[in-house]
Amino acid sequence: MPELAKTYDPVGTEARWQQAWEDQGAFHPDPKAPGEPFSVVIPPPNVTGSLHMGHAFNTALIDTIVRYQRLAGKNVLCLPGTDHASIAVQTILEKQLKQEGKTRHHLGRDGFLERAWQWKAESGGRIVGQLRRLGYSVDWQRQRFTLDEGLSEAVKEAFVRLHEQGLIYRGEYLVNWCPASGSAVSDLEVEMKEVDGHLWHFRYPLSSGDGHLEVATTRPETMLGDTAVAVNPTDERYAHLVGQTLTLPFVGREIPIVADDHVEKDFGTGCVKVTPAHDPNDFAIGQRHGLPQITVMRKNGTMNKEAGQFEGLDRFEARKAVVAGLDELGLLVKVEDYRHSVPYSDRGKVPVEPLLSTQWFVRTEPLAARCREALEKQDPRFIPERWEKVYRDWLTDIRDWCISRQLWWGHRIPAWFVISETGGKYTDTTPYVVARNEVEALEKAKAKYGAAAVIEQDEDVLDTWFSSGLWPFSTLGWPDAESADLQRWYPTSTLVTGFDIIFFWVARMTMMAGAFTGEMPFQDVYIHGLVRDEQNRKMSKSAGNGIDPLLLIDRYGTDALRFALVREVAGAGQDIRLDYDRKTDTSATVEASRNFANKLWNATRFALMNLGDETPAQLGDPDPAALQLADRWILSRLARVNRETAERYSNYGLGEAAKGLYEFAWNDVCDWYLELSKRRLNPGENPSAEALADQRVAKQVLAKVISQMHQMLHPLMPHLTEELWHSVTGKSETTFLALQPWPALQESALDDALEASFADLIGAIRVVRNLRAVAGLKPSQSVPVRFVTGRGELAAVLNQGTADITALTRAESVAVMAPAEADAAPVAKALAGVSGELQVLLPIEGLVDLDALKGRLEKDIAKAEKEIKGLAGRLGNPNFADKAPPEVVAECQANLDEKQAQADLARKRLADLS
């Protein structure tokens, strides 16, 4: 068998196995291969992006799931890909052009797109390379990009079909408009920011001259587009005014006073200015009352001719000018400081404007209805279940989806305007045809408008989420219903994603899938939480607390980071915390996982040194009749952990699986079984035939436990376990642990009573070790040990384990007694300890300086009493007990209880020695 290096080199090991898996096509499944299908399409990161901790967390969860399913015998496809990220890429390129003194219009559409593809080729692979470093067991040969030819055809097909069904239409509606990028943006691309602004109160005079109404707004510049003032129909203060008109300052327009239930009569003055062309709520009021929609702002953020004297001013300059003008007219009542949420363009980094614009929309209600119906059958199933309500609420309270963007990089809308019908130019009244390509479009145009029809394709592109919504099935070959991948792996098995895009991505995928495949696109939706810092703050660029995963990977290794992230999960969907020292680029949490990796490495080296040249297969299974107590215990633990871990992996209990395996590997295997096996693995010179037979049994058990431990840990720490498993099994480098079956569960090995009794034996050994430390015994000193218990089964286990106890405690002798027997032969000058129902006595007279030991105990008591006094005083202080955070008070009480217990124990030991 190959020899393991003394120390673990994670970076070199990980790179080698990643290359080996890829070279051998380990994760490139054949759709015709046997096994139940299991498929996951990864959420496609933007090509502009770089790896952040959210990606690392998502990857760790997905890869743990798919690697287990592979071990469980499934035919697994994990399909990777990237998103073209229309706005993000275009923003980057336009910034580059600006530095060159150019705009995209200098290049023209074709030239700009050529540059975009060149940029994608040069820079777009960065995040893919970073994802590879995470050890993703995906099929890189099936990697997709949302602008790939096949996916582009799927997008066109989807658009055409939805249009033919009347579910895509063109109309003028309010959209989020980013003046910086000159495009409509989706709700997801809008970030709400808390800002310190103002609330301006001003009066609108009644046209009759008999008074005024007072309104308030955070956007005074929009008042130029007001077409009404609304009051609540039950508000008696204004009931007599409904139907009258007000005169709008500056423009002199008369606007009606309308009654609408949207108005809260107890908020402010109970009067709301209505600007249908610049506010979504006002737009709805305007629709209900047939109000005109007056746009006062251009798409570049300057005021238009409808703004009268303010035409040409930037929107923020206009705000100041309008306020100053109202003040001059005596209409400004007051200005209040006001902290409120303002929608910002995520890409343009400027406040967005709700603007009326002619755009393409998807009629979402018919699509959402199909999803709601499926959800009644838990299709898909949400983990945790609480997110199902969030998903249902989004599908219930839904608006039509604006899918057009005024950009060049992206899926160009497959619609052609018949410009020959409007004098050879595009106008708002130009008719259009929708088609899969220009040839089909021209045929449709000629059929409808005559042979002389001239067409011109829409300049706009589709919202990135349109193509992302097709991701689960377009990547598998749709619209080709005969696609082998589509037939084998669709619907997909599990979607793993964050809660923040349940509507923006999850719901759009289910709506699209329902429309085009008649099925929901995934069976399960696993919603994970956020990665937070040590202060429980969400990690983000704006907070400046993000962590570059590659820094931690370079320092500790990919497996250490992955294991740390998954182990932190306290339950499906829960946020996790990750500490990080920015001065040293270190993380205690990830370092602990690296130490665990080193522990596994050293345990495997120990096994290799003791197994000789025999592999687990060559050693075979031990004879059950020849098993020692420790063997039966560790094999029972192995079977139990096997069963629990498989259940946890299968049911998304990934954090619980990681914690359970950590405890098993570190405590049961490394701390106890390896220590207990040492004397048997090294029987000394001229061993007896019985000792040699027992040595072989110990080797057989050790080989089985170590190799299966590697298998069970593989989904969590794939590179490390692949390396260690190969070293133990001697398999060739083209035979992968990643593709082996999950270890068979040995039900017959399970023994609840034995595990409970052995836990008592471990407790007894711990107490003896602790008493030796209290006494200050040297490691070379042997001392008799006396155990006292009234439990017969515990006494039997202690008697069976006498040799183990002697070896691990350096006991001179071990005596197991019943209470009556111990009372009949009392021991003087002994240290006593307790473990459950077991009393442990360590006679030390003649072995240590009793006076010195008593002196140490008296010092311990004095120190504890001083700390007790301080803690009790703190808790007795009302300023602390009543005002400190509850968790701080609870921690103080716990410290007090601990110190009191320590003092009581020291007093008892002092009394025993007196």
Curated annotation (Swiss-Prot):
Classification via InterPro entries: aa-tRNA-synth_I_CS (IPR001412), aa-tRNA-synth_Ia (IPR002300), Anticodon_Ia_Val (IPR033705), M/V/L/I-tRNA-synth_anticd-bd (IPR013155), Rossmann-like_a/b/a_fold (IPR014729), tRNA-bd_arm (IPR010978), tRNAsynth_Ia_anticodon-bd (IPR009080), Val-tRNA_synth_C_sf (IPR037118)
Compartment(s) of residence: Cytoplasm
Keyword tags: Aminoacyl-tRNA synthetase, ATP-binding, Coiled coil, Cytoplasm, Ligase, Nucleotide-binding, Protein biosynthesis
Gene Ontology, cellular component aspect: cytosol
Chief location of this protein within or outside the cell: cytoplasm
Motif 'HIGH' region per record, residues: 45-55
Function per UniProt: Catalyzes the attachment of valine to tRNA(Val). As ValRS can inadvertently accommodate and process structurally similar amino acids such as threonine, to avoid such errors, it has a 'posttransfer' editing activity that hydrolyzes mischarged Thr-tRNA(Val) in a tRNA-dependent manner.
Protein name in the entry: Valine--tRNA ligase
